[in-house]
Amino acid sequence: MDSDPAFTQLAIAKGVPWYVEFFQRFDRLFTFGANIGTQASDIPVGAFTWHKTWQPITLDDWRAAPAPGGPSTSLGPGRFSTVMTWQIESFTDVGGNKDIEFVKFIDLPSQTRQPFELAINGPQKLLREHGWETVDAMKVSRTPWEYREFIHRSKAEFGVAKHTYVANHTGWFSDRTECYLASGRPALVQDTGWTAHLPSGEGLLAFSNPDEAVAGIERINADYDRHARSAAEIAREHFDASRLLPRLLEISCS
């Protein structure tokens, strides 16, 4: 299961023997990059066939009480949040980490009254200087229950993607975002090409630049309850394990 589309394929394309041999051991390969191996992305796949999938979610484990911030008539105290890594330690020869994209949106807190909270292992001082509230990512993700609690106390997700996902139009969609949606939390996330495969506009919104991000925040806050309901419905329709696993097994056993 490839959760880092483009990074994985680009590393294979470099032809490092042990890495290529590792993937040759498998009968079927799956990826979270919905555009990998299609004309929508120029990432090379070589002799490998990658099957598109989303991360299966057990919805009962993510049901939550209404989000902080109350009804959609006001901003309320709830925060748009995410859990993120500024730069990954793997694939250092590929590059294209999240920091490259995030700096494009670093002044977002000054463009909206909406509060933000980042759980991040990155330059917290720099981010706080630009108006982001920050906590240590490890502190909120040591256990599945702490991770879930952080998401449940959030109003919505604001998520930026790694530069490699965006630049190569991979169609990557985050399993973290799935958890927000399954919790009934709307998600405003950067477009990597996933909008060709998933609904966008209610509950799940895409952005590609700061103006679109601000507009998305305003749309969610203008009718929060509707977006929260739509978020949960998208999770049921597209990420429910009872729907995804049969197809995974069918492809794996074919």
Regions of interest found by a model, annotated:
Residues 2-175, 179, 186, 190-201:
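Nucleotide-sugar donor-binding catalytic core of glycosyltransferases
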Residues 76, 205-226:
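C-terminal "capping" alpha-helix adjacent to the active site of nucleotide-linked donor transferases
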Residues 97-101, 139-142, 212, 223, ...:
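Soluble or luminal CAZymes and related metallo-dependent hydrolases
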Residues 188, 198, 206, 210, ...:
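Conserved catalytic or regulatory cores that recognize and/or transform ribose-phosphate-containing ligands
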Residues 222-252:
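A charged, aromatic-enriched C-terminal amphipathic alpha-helix characteristic of glycosyltransferases
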